[in-house]
Amino acid sequence: MLTASIIAIVIYLAIMIGAGAYAKRWVNDADDYMLAGREFGFVCNVMELCAVALAGSLLTFVPTLVLDYGLKTAIIGYICMLGLGYCVYGILYGKLARDNGSQTVAEYLEIRYSSKVRTLVAIASSITMMGITANNVLAIGNIFSELLGFPQLLTVSICFIAIIIFSMMSGFWGITLTDMIQVVIGGIAFIGLGAFVMAKFGGLDWLAANFPSPDVWNVGVTGTVTPVLSLRYPSFFTLGLNYMVFILWGSNYYFLRLNTCRNGKVGRNSYMLTGLIMIPILLIPIALAGAYTAAIYPEQFGADGTLGGAQAIAYLLREQIPTPLVVFILIGALAVTVSTASTSLIGVTSTISRDIYQRLLRPSSNTEQVLKAQKYIMFGVGIVGWLLCFYPGGTVFLFGFATSWLGPVAILMIMASFWPRFTNQGAFWGALVGMVLLTLSTLFGDVLGIFNTSNYVHASVLGLFSALVVGVVVSLFTKPNYYGERGWTRLPDPSSRTVQPLTDFDKKVLAMTRYGRITMAEITDYLGCDSRESKASVEKLDRCGYIVRASMYSYKFYHFDISKSGEAVLAPLSEAEQTLKADAQLSLEQFQMLAAAAVSHENMLKFAAARHMGSLNQTAIISLLDHRGYVKQTGLMKRKVVLTDAGRRVVESHKTLATV
């Protein structure tokens, strides 16, 4: 089995690296490397989310929950909480993340709060995602060590080297292409494993009769029952906080996944389908496999046994599963590890690159410099992730430690979306206090062993409530942003608007709103700027009364229309431009790109290249044409633009304005 496994792993890694090399041709600039040009469709994103959910760490984490606390804790406390979290996240943030123009969680929080908040959140997100990366690699390292007899240090190191090489090659394009292969392999492997043990030993009645505890559903092998509302970890309350809220709402790579979608609807629907259907189908077999291992080998995995949940799957594979199936499952385990770890690796790379390197260290860097820096950053992040593999407590506590840092970030996300009165100072001090308490808790508890707060309250609860209480109290005693002030109205009111001089950049932003409703993402992507620049301009235009937000809450807060006074300060359009605006709500350039697409998708790309449009410049116009109902975006991964009947009518009506 050893020889067959090594050969299969080498072949698999060679195929994945080859796929990454193939996808490299799609990377045109730094935005392509990190966002894949915002081109992914529904099926592609569902498969991506499944690949992220089907993490290699689950092969040790889920069986550990089963053996320590029973099936209910693993299935309800983790799997169902995670699935529900996907659904809620998709509903609340699917359109918001895609429409606000930011690329990272930290960047989004700057456009709502301040640059200081962005820096704090960038640090917290980086720590979290490095911990999650390490957790996934450590899990697969444990399984390979147990099954093949290799030292854990060697297996963990080999996995990290492979992931770093693979991820550095082609960014999100390569990760996505290979993820679609890997989720199929991993899904078949783990569903097949659960089905195999049930077919061989019997159904759930056999499991209940042989599991080394009186109640396989409620009680672990040592007789431990998971509390419901305890503030310690794990309880159903802390499990829910970590895996339904924090890991999603505060994590950058879930935010990135929404930003790679063609539109917010694709993001929302893909999260909902994954959470409702795919996560239970993919993850419950892993929980059952862990439970069956303890039932088959009660002496080894029972209360007096020497083995635990982290070794359960590897032990089951070695003792009960035929060699060909073992090799396939090993490849599946490696596949999902590479998938999730590479996604979290690029998530933290994007945070450090965009929120620290481009903003603080090298704000004037060009595309080539940013792309080069991203690869160096990814390598450094990989090294730190490798070191975190040796965090005390194993996969369960490493996962809990990593996700607990997301508590303050999740609070800021919630308040940013639904409470305009939450102030910049409240966000900063809430996040800072939460992170300081988390740091002290980790230092004095896990590192120095002086005082372990986890004996009383888990770090996730500590971070959540400290950030919430401090943030709310400070907000009540500090001045909010203008739109949170009493008396501010969404619709322009002369008593609350103040005219200010406009820069050339402000006029460019305002001009983009004159052709009908437009999103912050379309403005930011088209102008090729950081969203803090577009945010500053939009806020100035709003305070002048030149634009109108569609709503004061959620994603429509980042949808804008021009007002009559805004139209008045712009230079008048030509007769042809005015006709095009009245008939189609398009600028001349937008119409010409539509006309180019009417010939063929390839012709549209030539049109964009001739005007030196980057990946996101193109996406901004295509997104707007999609919103207007003039095009459809098809294709599994790479986008293909096809005109609708309405789009063809517009082109035919104004064909004299087309240049191609």
Label each region the model flagged:
Residues D506-A511, Q590-A597, I622, V651:
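Hydrophobic residues on short alpha-helical segments
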Residues G528-R543, H612-R628, K638:
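Short amphipathic alpha-helical interaction segments
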Residues M1-Y555, K564, Q578:
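Membrane-embedded helix-loop-helix hairpins and adjacent transmembrane boundary segments
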Residues L502-F505, A584-Q590:
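Short helix-coil-helix linker/hinge
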Residues I562-S587, D645-V660:
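Short, amphipathic alpha-helical interaction segments positioned at domain boundaries
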